[in-house]
Amino acid sequence: MRHALITGGSRGIGAAAVRAFTAAGYAVSFLYEKNDAAAAAVSAETGAEAVRCDVADAQAVLDAVSRLPETDVLVNNAGICHYGLISQITQAQWDRLFAVNVGGIYHCVNAVLPAMLHRQSGCIINVSSMWGQVGASCEACYSATKGAVLALTKALAQELGPSGIRVNCVSPGVILTDMVANVAPEVLAELAQEAPLGKNGTPEDVAQAMVYLAGAGFVTGQNLPVNGGFVL
């Protein structure tokens, strides 16, 4: 049975990915930072193994991966955001966003890569954002990290393709998760109307795209927008 490792799997898009990959027949493990109760609930529901780990900590990632089966599919979903003017972002906030959103991918890829290289096969799916494509006012740091994810995805696809390893990413639009929990309902409604499909997305919408990319054997270096047409 193929093994999928999903980061940030205790809630939102990550939890939906755990469910989707389990339903698709994968053995699934997931990393989570601190929400023990949510992680336990997802694990009990799906049978997936949960490991507490901050992906910004390189050694913690290596230790976590060493406890798990070899990874066939790595889903780099863990991410955080910050809303505010660029002049109001502290150095610590800036550094933390890059440490998690970009550094976390670096650490997780390097942790699973030796086994993938040995097998000459593997699949890596990163999570960017439509704001990584076009930028968002008051989300400069978040947009910058997600733009970096897009560039990293393409570079890794070039580098790892000759070794049989595919690297792609998904770029969610407005998805109804905890990340938008503080957005006023009327603002969410306005955002929905800006998308040609006239609605906001769900975590399951993104998870379905991830499962597709995991099985798309001739697709690499691509960004799959999941945004209802918000950004074309």
PLM segments and residue spans:
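Catalytic Tyr-X3-Lys loop
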Residues: 80, 87-106, 121, 125, ...
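C-terminal substrate-recognition "lid" of short-chain dehydrogenase/reductases
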Residues: 106, 199-226, 231
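Residue(s) in the substrate-gating loop at a strand-loop-helix junction
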Residues: 129
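Conserved glycine-rich cofactor-binding loop
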Residues: 10-11
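Active-site helix of classical SDR
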Residues: 109, 145, 153
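Alpha-helical segment proximal to the catalytic Tyr-Lys
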Residues: 114, 158-162
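Substrate-binding pocket helix/loop in short-chain dehydrogenase/reductase
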Residues: 85-86, 93-98, 180, 187, ...
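Conserved glycine-rich Rossmann-like NAD(P)H-binding loop of the short-chain dehydrogenase/reductase
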Residues: 24-39
